[in-house]
UniProtKB/Swiss-Prot annotation:
Post-translational modification remark: The N-terminus is blocked.
Residue stretches in coiled coil: none
Function summary: Calcium-dependent regulator of light sensitivity of cGMP phosphodiesterase in rod outer segments. Controls rhodopsin phosphorylation in a Ca(2+)-dependent manner.
Binding site for Ca(2+) 2: D110, D112, N114, T116, E121
Lipid-anchored residues (N-myristoyl glycine): G2
UniProt protein name: S-modulin
Record PROSITE patterns: EF_HAND_1, EF_HAND_2
Chain segments annotated as transmembrane: none
Family of the protein in this entry: Belongs to the recoverin family.
A Pfam family the protein falls into: EF-hand_7
Annotated Ca(2+) 1 binding sites: D74, N76, D78, T80, E85
GO biological process, alphabetically ordered: visual perception
Key words of the record: Calcium, Lipoprotein, Metal-binding, Myristate, Repeat, Sensory transduction, Vision
Length: 202
């Protein structure tokens, strides 16, 4: 947890964020000043996070997905994120090291936090992702994955699971490493998130 209540970012947090987000020091300081304007306390609530996330997707409904992203990064369940957690949350959805990203993806899909993923949880996240895909883009999705239910079924088949089976973190990560098609199916198009972040920054 970083202390982000002061007017300037600490050297340690800056270095860590430069490493994890690939933003320059100048860019991070700009993000931080913007963050403090919206969240003077140095912490962001779930509602504020949803509001900021919504600005990236004016032609879609990212609220449900934003709630799940927030949950997955609110490690101590206090209902807030500090600046470091906030930036990593935004960037982990669009970039990040492979292992970190897969570990985060498991947390995202483990909706109830019990250490395993079931098919219902996959459907919940996929449904949230579909709300972020505009109607025109949905028309161009392959026939066997153009609804949340179809995409969830396809993912579950790729993992070799029956409807009532559960996935452990090891199975989840191993399955994706072996079959990159699963990674494509479980995530919102990362390039679109990256583009939205760059638009917001300028």
């Amino acid at each position: 947890m970083g202390n982000t209540k002061s007017g300037a970012l600490s050297k340690e947090i800056l270095e860590e964020l430069q490493l994890n987000t690939k933003f320059t020091q100048e860019e991070l300081c700009t993000w931080y000043q913007s963050f403090l304007k919206e969240c003077p306390s140095g912490r962001i609530s779930k509602k504020q996070f949803e509001s900021i996330y919504s600005k990236f997707f004016p032609d879609a409904d990212p609220k449900a997905y934003a709630q799940h992203v927030f949950r997955s990064f609110d490690a101590n369940n206090d209902g807030t994120l500090d600046f470091k957690e906030y930036m990593i949350a935004l960037m982990m959805t669009s970039s990040g090291k492979a292992n970190q990203k897969l570990e985060w993806a498991f947390c995202l899909y483990d909706v109830d936090g019990n250490g395993t993923i079931n098919k219902k949880e996959v459907l919940e996240i996929i449904t949230a992702i579909f709300k972020m895909i505009n109607a025109e883009d949905q028309k161009h999705l392959p026939e066997d994955e153009n609804t949340p239910e179809k995409r969830t079924n396809k993912i579950w088949v790729y993992f070799g699971k029956k409807d009532d089976d559960k996935l452990t973190e090891g199975e989840f990560i191993q399955g994706i490493v072996k079959n990159k098609e699963i990674l494509r199916l479980i995530q919102y198009e990362p390039q679109k998130v990256k583009d939205k972040l760059k638009e917001k920054k300028h």
